[in-house]
Amino acid sequence: MIYYIIMVVFSPYTAIIPAVYSVNLLLKRKVKVERNYWNIGLFSLFLYSMFSGLINKSLLSFLASFGLFLYFTVCIFAQNYFTKMSRINMVLKIVTYLSVIAAIGGVIEKITFILLNRPEHRIFSSFGNPNMTGAWFANIILIIFYLQGTKKSSSETLTYNLVIILISVALLLTESTGAFIALIGGIFIYYITSRNKNKKEIIAVCTIVGLLSLLFVFIQNKITKTTPIGEIVISFNSRIGIWEGSTKMFFKKPILGWGLLGTFERGSNFIFSYDPSLHNKIISFLIHPHNLWLTFLVSTGVIGLGIYLYIKFNLYKDMTKLYKEKNQLFPLLAATNAMIIIQGIVDCTLYAPQLGIMFVCMGAITYNIANDKMVRKRKLIKNKDIAV
């Protein structure tokens, strides 16, 4: 398992390999396939996006739809694998420690670009994009909060504290305003849903958030010569034109959409077409409308968004069960989902293979726990009257 986690953490390209492995398991019938909302939803999204690609005569969108098929098979594998809490905790620990290596790589990357007289460079580490890198590290910080609650020794406490400092530094170096704001929202959700709240923890969390905010302000001011508010304004202003053009695309094809890579292929006809300078600067690398829900509407129309909302609705029903049962994992699951929603206002993290895999795995864990799919330890009762 560790080799597949390494492939996911260290490159968006090698992250595909574990997904292909899950396809192999499915074809050989080595995994059980349940008829649940995750499997129905992801497979339906795959079929509909493939159909949209065909109707739009887009080879790229047709091929990209198989990415959803890979998410579907990864989700099936996760449902079969994450049936024990020991496995879940083990994977979360491995992902965290490997992310430390990615964070160190990001710090080295920043130092290298400073030496090359490019201090404005935003790190992307092993995730290919600063915003996706920020989202990954923000999720890892939330995972560390959970792992701190499962610690068994004081040495683990010290280790996690050091790790969270390093990951936080790496997050700040991405300068991803969306990921940072999403993290603050995620931390808020984590602690209002946490069972074991005390004054010391609340003070510690407020201190961490305060220090991170101050550091973020300092970095934005010194490196990019702007403030977080200014960065938010710039970020929204650059996206408004994208959203306007994407909305036009949606109204042109509201049912079928333009295919998963429709924005990349046809967006130039709608987005910033009135401003050549912005058009050439932004549209050349734009693969989605920089909004989670608008991405579904443009790529797969109202049907695609409806399928996604079907998955989310049932996911929240399962999360409600976990909340009522006071499950230990619930704060983490709620916080990571909150992050997707918050950052989804200005980005679509599900287009990144590493974050997409994390999303479906967290979803599979939620489903398994809420629907009693976990393997429980059986207590063996010795009966002296029974001959062995």
Language model: regions and residue ranges:
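Transmembrane signal-anchor hairpin modules in multi-pass inner-membrane enzymes, especially those
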Residues: 1-54, 59-60, 73, 80-96, ...
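Transmembrane alpha-helices of multi-pass inner-membrane enzymes
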Residues: 18-25, 329-388
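Alpha-helical transmembrane segments of multi-pass inner-membrane proteins
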Residues: 21, 50, 73, 89-118, ...
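Hydrophobic transmembrane alpha-helices and their immediate junctions
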Residues: 30, 159, 188, 192, ...
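A membrane-periplasm/extracellular boundary helix in multi-pass inner-membrane enzymes
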Residues: 104, 110, 173, 193-236, ...
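A conserved mid-to-late transmembrane alpha helix and its immediate loop/hinge
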Residues: 168, 278-319, 342
